[in-house]
Structures are given as structure tokens and as C-alpha cells.
Amino acid sequence: MKISEMNNVLFFTYYILGDSMALKGVVLDSGHGGSDFGASGNGIIEKDLTLKISKYMYDRLKALGIPVKMTRDSDITLDPKDRVRVVQDQFGNSSDVVVVSNHINAGGANGKNVGNV
């Protein structure tokens, strides 16, 4: 995977390696949801935008033939344990799974964060 930036937008480029790649799947985690609104501003609510982004990513990855699941596909509340449970229910404790958690941070963030669990 390659991460690049242009005009304060992060681009994630995934390289598909054919049979040599042992990737079991990708799990897309739409940050917040339900009673947890996340950040908001200019009429945009984080939980709605992260779900929209995750649905777009889901469609694109599915079109590429990559096994993909979402922690939520509607406006529901999930605590962190629920999110982990979704991954484990689908893929077990495999290290061959990529989990992408989408968030739109407010406040003092510089607009680009990459973290790991």
C-alpha cells in the first residue's frame, strides 16, 4: 500500500499481488454511528460522512475482487468491542486482514493521521 497526499487529501493506493498475496480481506470501520455523532461542522456530521466514505470504499474494493466487510452499514451505535467482534466473526484472529477505520477529526488535528491497532 502506498499513501500519498495532494492538496490536503490522502490517497491510499493498494497493490494487488495475485496469488502471492495472502490477504484474507479488508474490514471497513465507519467511525462513530448511532448515538455517537462524532465531530460536526458546517452541517456535516462525522458519523454520516464516515459511513458514506466506507460504503464508497466497499463498492470499489468489491469491484476489484477484494473480500471486504463493514463493521456497520447503517446508523447504529457500536462500541469498540463490537467493532473487534465484527472483524473476528468474519476473519478470526488472522493477521492477514486489513482494518481501515474512517474518521474525520476536528480540533487541532492537521488533517492527516495514520494509526494502527
Regions found by a protein language model. Give the residues of each.
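Catalytic-core regions of hydrolytic enzymes
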Residues: L17-V117
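Short, Lys/Arg-enriched N-terminal segments with co-localized hydrophobic residues
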Residues: M1-S20
